[in-house]
Amino acid sequence: GRGAHHRAHPAFAMFAGLPGAQGLDAPALQAWLGVGGGQMLWDDLGAQFGFKPLVAGHTGPSAGLWAGARLETAAEFSGSRIQVAGIAADVVRALGAVPVDNIDPSDLRAAFADGRVHAAELLGPLAVVTSGIEPLAQRLYAPGINGNGMLLSLQVRKPLWDRMSTADQAIFEACAAEEYRLSLAEAQAHALIAAQVAGPAKWPVRLAFSGEVASALAAAARDVVEQIAATDPAARRIHDSYQAFRGLMGQARIA
């Protein structure tokens, strides 16, 4: 689902991670927060709701969208029950799908079997291994919808944060940053473990989204992000900063 902070203010989604090409990958997101002005904008937004936000982890990139049936056309999304995180729920809803709240990986195989879910994007490589969904979700559409993965945050109550010394605040920030670094290392290691466990299995069949579906998802993602930006002036400032940094990253990759 969207999470409590998104419900408090839609612009919090900009810090958690955006779907498709609208989003920054984990290193770029950290760069925007650390030196691109993102943390100051996040601090301002968090202060309105009484907390100081810190980066404290990341899921790593998504393996893709696991599906038990074909999702080759936009029409095939219609009525499909799809588990996705964050504002990707609004993206699949735009294609006529029914977003499903996060199901525990241990229950996901049963959810596929009884029709509670038809497709799921699992963030974290070991979630796939522990869920055992491969025989039921035989198609893996990569890179998925939240291809860049999602940031995990730590919120410190603002009165507590303001009472801390500068040194204590620096310790908190350093520990949170180290957790972020370790989480990315874990995600990379877990992806290798997951690949080894999977071995030369028949399933899943790895597929790219069709041009029709990719275009529909991209258009929906742009619309959803623009709706967030239109919430209020604070959301517009966050959006413009994020997208300007995304543009710089794109130019750097081309160069």
Region annotations inferred by a language model:
Residues 1-28, 44-255:
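N-terminal secretory/targeting leader peptides
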Residues 33-37, 187-190:
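Soluble or luminal CAZymes and related metallo-dependent hydrolases
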Residues 34-48:
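Hinge/lid segment of periplasmic solute-binding proteins
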